Amino acid sequence: MEEVEKALKEGTILSLLNFFPVEDGENYFIPSGTIHAIGKGVTVIEIQQNSNLTYRLYDYNRIGNDGKPRELHIQKALKVIDTKAYHPISFQEPLIGECKYFSSSVHNVKGIPMIQANKESFISITFLTGEGSVNSIPYKALDTFFIPAGKEAVLNGSGTFVLTTVNR
């Protein structure tokens, strides 16, 4: 942990990070507490358990809307950081991520014309590609829909989507 704190003070934190080149369609399951960043030009769907906390360790010296550097949360973050080396976790598709809080899987719209949310929790649908409608509401790539607990969604169109369910 001292190495992380020293690198933060010296402005060399990037030297401690592992960089993973990414390609379209890849997914990475990153457990909470893992230091991570999203590179320039990369679009992600970040699915996580409900939390009101995000600790910023480094912010590339960006300026906030108020004209001042954005707030960092170094001491709080140091208490929860997992410094073990990150190794990508593989899942057997359609599953692309799973933890005690949620499960995410990727599907083709043509293969699943209707989705039913269970009575305990909502489901989330994020479209990666294609266009069409969910319950007659149009969608395009990167649109997200939340289906309330106990309700259903009728899908029409084309493309792929990520389906996320809450684990109980």
What residues fall within each predicted segment?
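Glycine- and acidic-residue-biased ligand/ion/polar-headgroup-sensing regions
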Residues: 1-4, 108-136, 141
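An exposed, glycine/acidic-rich loop-and-rim segment of catalytic or binding clefts
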Residues: 8-18, 27-29, 35-83
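A generic structural signal for well-ordered coil/turn residues at beta-strand boundaries
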Residues: 16, 24, 32, 41, ...
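Short acidic-glycine-tyrosine-enriched beta hairpin
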Residues: 17-29, 133-153
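His/acidic/aromatic-lined binding-pocket segments of jelly-roll/cupin-type domains
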Residues: 19-20, 27-28, 36, 115-117, ...
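Ligand-binding loop in jelly-roll beta-barrel domains
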Residues: 33-53, 138-140, 149-168
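C-terminal amphipathic alpha-helical segment
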Residues: 54-122
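A structural signal for short secondary-structure junctions
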Residues: 98-101, 116-120, 126, 138-140, ...
